[in-house]
Amino acid sequence: MQFRVLCLFMFVSAISCSDKSSAIVSDTKTDEPAKKPVQSGSQKKGACFTTKNAAWSSKVSALNVYWHYSWGVDANMKEPDSVRFVPMIWGKWSVEKSLLIVDSLAKVGKVKHLLGFNEPDGKEQANMTVDESLAFWPQLMKVNLPLGSPACVHADNDWMKGFMAKAAEKGYRVDFICVHWYGGANSQSLLDHLKLIHNLYNRPIWLTEFAPADWSATSPATSKVTKAMALTFMQQILPALEKMDYVERYSWFSADPGSAALGNSALFDTAGKLTLLGDYYSKF
């Protein structure tokens, strides 16, 4: 994936590309805790917003999701009622300290799963070798939560294949595969990719970041993925994901509406209101 910037925080609240980065931190209004219980029609549907986004809590609530992750480990007190927080160990920084937080949350039942490193195969993301990632892996396993794999730029690349092969040799536990996908507005292409990943690793899948994108676009207006195409894609893919037994969770990535590559796939407009796409996701 191209056009990335590095976002490192003490407890690591990061994302996967520069278009995405600007989208997540652009809100300026102060958010208030979302206290109204959220009832999602799906126990798979999720949201990904860093808590550095001022309006993250209200956005998570507006999307009516079952779960949320922030690329970090803190279960913020503003988490909407009935939404399950899922922590992530983003990279190699402060792993031990982050895991102490996760362990404390797990012991009181606040978290039930743990996500592995964010795009360690990306130089502008976690940027870790396979062996380096494996060296930390026993610490993640020790928390004794269902553990998601590193979420690679491409889950079928040599980095991921090497990690899974060496993890198997060492007897390390990887309970489900985290997948990122930013292809065009072709739902069958994504379904084929998920089938490939499942066949490769024989694990359940969490589709933790996905949205149709045009990486050659210079503005949303020039994108080959129009808003209408993004909506059609969503209308096709969400019911299909619900029917796939091995897809346990999914989370649409909502970029800044001004993003050239991903703006037409945004769930919120510049005023922070649901787009037509966001309204469909919320009601699904």
Q: Which functions belong to the PLM regions below?
A:
Residues 5-12:
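Sec-dependent N-terminal signal peptides
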Residues 14-40:
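Bacterial Sec-dependent N-terminal signal peptides
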Residues 25, 81-91, 199, 224, ...:
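Aromatic-rich peripheral "rim/lid" segments of glycoside hydrolase catalytic domains that contact
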Residues 41-45, 63-67, 81-85, 109-113, ...:
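Loop/turn elements at helix/coil->beta-strand transitions in domains of secreted/extracellular proteins
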Residues 42-114, 131:
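N-terminal carbohydrate-binding/catalytic regions of secreted carbohydrate-active enzymes
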Residues 57, 99-103, 130-144, 160-164, ...:
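Generic structural signal for well-ordered alpha-helices
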Residues 70, 87, 118, 160-220, ...:
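Aromatic- and acid-rich polysaccharide-binding/catalytic face
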Residues 106-130, 136, 148-156, 172-181, ...:
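Active-site groove signature of glycoside hydrolases
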